């Protein structure tokens, strides 16, 4: 006997598809995962727009790196003494220009200081030379006056009468008179030369040996005046000790005193002559 066939319940196609098909959310996720894996391991070359985008991003990164490096230590730029320093390829040239300018300024200050020092030294030297010139002229005039008074008094030292006497009888008095006459002539010429030099800025007789000649003559006349005055004083003392004081001895003593003062004037003139000898350009 045949058993009756069992009839299966009929199902609509829509119901079958809904029961057996996976949920749509899972299917979308699987597709997304598959797509990502395929794109990740794909050996096909990337599209050109992606390369351009990557190269542009690399350029931007390369530009941003030095800027970030500069901004890491901003204090270093501020610590530099020169405000002109900029981080470029010509940074060395800028750094080299700044110290040269500073050194030029410092050098100009030193040069100006040296110029002012030289000017002040020249002014001091000119003033010293003027003082020396006027001092020399003053001593020369003193020599003229003192030598003139000395030999004038000695030449007039004469007495009349049976006990009369005269200076020309004693060699000491004659020696003193002669030395004072020579001193008067020499000092008169030197006084005229100094006065002419102060007015015209030149000497009556210009010679390279003139300072040496003046120094030697001043020294010689100073020693001669000293020796003549000493010899005349000895004769006066001998006369007074034997005969006592009178008009003759008093006039001789006055002449000797003027001669001694003339010696002092020549001594100072010899010092000035020595200064002029070792400073040829002063007078």
Swiss-Prot record:
UniProt keyword annotation of Protein biosynthesis present: no
Topology with respect to the bilayer: Multi-pass membrane protein
Domain of life: Eukaryota
Biased composition (Low complexity): 9-20
A single GO cellular-component term on record: plasma membrane
Extracellular-side positions: 157-174, 234-251
Keyword annotations: Cell membrane, Membrane, Transmembrane, Transmembrane helix
Membrane side Cytoplasmic: residue ranges: 1-135, 196-212, 273-283
Record flagged with keyword Magnesium: no
InterPro entries: CASP_dom
Residues that span the membrane, as ranges: 136-156, 175-195, 213-233, 252-272
Compartments, as annotated in UniProt: Cell membrane
Ranges annotated as biased composition (Basic and acidic residues): 50-79
Disordered as annotated region, ranges: 1-86
Record text on subunit structure and interactions: Homodimer and heterodimers.
Protein family membership: Belongs to the Casparian strip membrane proteins (CASP) family.
Protein name: CASP-like protein 4A3
Organism name: Arabidopsis thaliana (Mouse-ear cress)
């Amino acid at each position: 006997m045949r058993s009756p066939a069992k009839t299966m319940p009929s199902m609509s196609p829509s119901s079958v598809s809904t029961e057996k098909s996976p949920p749509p959310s899972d299917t979308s996720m699987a597709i997304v995962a598959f797509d990502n894996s395929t794109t990740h391991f794909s050996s096909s070359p990337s599209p050109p727009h992606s390369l351009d985008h990557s190269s542009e991003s690399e350029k931007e990164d390369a530009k941003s790196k030095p800027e970030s490096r500069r901004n890491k230590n901003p204090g270093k730029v501020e610590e530099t003494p020169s405000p002109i320093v900029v981080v470029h390829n010509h940074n060395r040239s800028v750094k080299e220009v700044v110290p040269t300018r500073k050194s030029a300024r410092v050098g100009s200050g030193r040069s100006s200081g040296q110029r002012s020092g030289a000017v002040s030294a020249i002014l001091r030297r000119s003033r010293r030379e003027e003082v020396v010139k006027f001092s020399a002229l003053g001593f020369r005039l003193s020599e003229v006056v003192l030598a003139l008074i000395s030999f004038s008094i000695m030449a007039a030292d004469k007495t009349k009468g049976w006990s009369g006497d005269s200076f020309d009888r004693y060699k000491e008095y004659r020696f003193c008179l002669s030395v004072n006459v020579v001193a008067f002539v020499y000092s008169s010429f030197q006084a005229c030369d100094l006065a002419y030099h102060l007015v015209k800025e030149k000497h009556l007789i210009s010679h390279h040996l003139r300072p040496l000649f003046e120094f030697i003559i001043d020294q010689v006349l100073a020693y001669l005046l000293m020796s003549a005055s000493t010899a005349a004083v000895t004769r006066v003392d001998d006369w007074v000790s034997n005969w006592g004081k009178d008009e003759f001895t008093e006039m001789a003593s006055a002449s000797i005193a003027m001669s001694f003062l003339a010696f002092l004037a020549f001594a100072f003139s010899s010092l000035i002559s020595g200064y002029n000898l070792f400073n040829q350009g002063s007078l």
